[in-house]
């Protein structure tokens, strides 16, 4: 975030960040309220030095103690003037993100969520002289710990992986470098196939968004809810073969490996499990079989790879 005073007088304002933490299952978050409202947990570091930067950080650790080894972190590249982690405290009873109570009152309540709906919000009070400019980096990230290194002390999560993550992006210069690298990555991917027409919307759809969605499909398959991790339904044999047609020109090496993974689940008679697990590379007849067009799509995907 870059803020510049283009006026002729000093300006005094406050900036708020606001995120709502998922409790690790987006679908369940929206319906299992009698359970979810009892599980939320956070830790807050109002001021901490990471590298050469003073920062503030909020850690979302719901179910970390009970059965998880991961947590989320929201941080800002300065020592914040206030924070909130309780949604009701920040927004207000019957309030709305369109006009949060804390913003309306120009304050923060330094609330600590214990159950209910954990959020992350920082308040930064800013003073700008005429022509003065200030920059802030807001970060949201994810960290994991091995089971034998979950805790820093009793009840306090091990934050070392979070510190390493935050130090990579906690200055405007580091942020600019990371953003440039991300732009180079996508420019390289998307430059493999370019359409030039008079219809700029068509160009944007074909050259950017369609190819981007194909890459998302490669990374996530046709996942939903908690299937992203490769559990439950897994990846579809037919789906994955069809998806190859969209991204084989972008990442042919990865497409080749995907073909090998898919083919490894095929039987000697040519039939196949309808789904397979990407983590184990094994199919499961309990979750579907007998889809006779499955192996036909492997031929189409392999042919597309050979042509590429």
Language-model segments: which ranges?
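Polysaccharide-binding surfaces and accessory modules of carbohydrate-active proteins
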Residues: 2-105, 122, 147-187
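Amphipathic alpha-helical scaffolding segments
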Residues: 17-20, 142-143, 260-265
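Beta-strand-rich interaction surfaces with strong enrichment in secreted/lumenal proteins
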Residues: 109-113, 123-128
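Short, positively charged
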Residues: 104-108, 218
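Substrate-binding groove/exosite segments of carbohydrate-active enzymes
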Residues: 115-118, 132, 187-308
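Hydrophobic beta-strand core residues of beta-sandwich domains
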Residues: 5-9, 128-130, 234
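A generic structural motif
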Residues: 3-8, 142-144, 249, 289
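Short Pro-Gly-centered flexible turn/kink motifs
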Residues: 11, 126-144
